[in-house]
Amino acid sequence: MAYRDQSLGELAIAIPRATKLFRELNLDFCCGGKQTLSRAAGKKDLNIDELEAQLEKLAAQPSDARDWREAPLADIIAYIIPRFHDRHREQLPELILMAKKVERVHHDKADCPHGLANQLTAIYNELSQHMMKEERILFPMIGQGMGANAAAPISVMEHEHDDAGRDVEVVKELTNGVVPPEGACNTWRALYSGINEFITDLMEHIHLENNLLFPRALRGE
């Protein structure tokens, strides 16, 4: 099957395991989910034939992941809040504490991620406000069947998702692609492992909203 003309968002929905592959290849399937596979691969100088072959293999594998394309929107919202919103509220305070410790203890090392704690704090504050607006305003509208009238708040949320994506890129720059240096202490390694987990969760979170929940809500489903 030819995947090159399909969008990253469509492929991430149709082939759940594709999100892991896209993350490994640094292909933005959440905020940049509307670009085609061919265009995204071209930007990264990836071999489109090899990429399609990898997706073919993933699509052929059985998956126990839920197919959200036909699920009631209320079910999607009920999944997003505990799986992503509550999880981010747990992840970020701990990551901020570890980042402060690493910056304090290793401030004299060349690879020290100076400014990381402040950047994570900014992400936490912005994301907390963002999720609160979704939970108090947008999600209730969608749950009450008013999604077709929610174009304005959805547009705001999508712009804030773009902002979050740019904030994550700053984190990657500060952390050498979130790769700990050789000889890094356990806290440093745990910090970067936790950041990678957070980024993976955030991308899945934004993908589910941008590419599935919001479009379906706007169609009045």
Curated annotation (Swiss-Prot):
Record bears the keyword Metal-binding: yes
Keywords: Cytoplasm, Iron, Metal-binding, Stress response
UniProt-listed InterPro entries: FeS-repair_YftE, Hemerythrin-like, RIC_family
Pfam families linked: Hemerythrin, ScdA_N
Gene Ontology terms for molecular function: metal ion binding
GO cellular component, one term: cytoplasm
One of the protein's GO biological processes: response to nitrosative stress
Top-level taxonomic group: Bacteria
Localization per record: Cytoplasm
Function: Di-iron-containing protein involved in the repair of iron-sulfur clusters damaged by oxidative and nitrosative stress conditions.
Subunit structure: Homodimer.
Family of the protein in this entry: Belongs to the RIC family. YtfE subfamily.
PANTHER family in UniProt: IRON-SULFUR CLUSTER REPAIR PROTEIN YTFE (PTHR36438:SF1)
Protein name: Iron-sulfur cluster repair protein YtfE
Source organism per UniProt: Pectobacterium atrosepticum (strain SCRI 1043 / ATCC BAA-672)
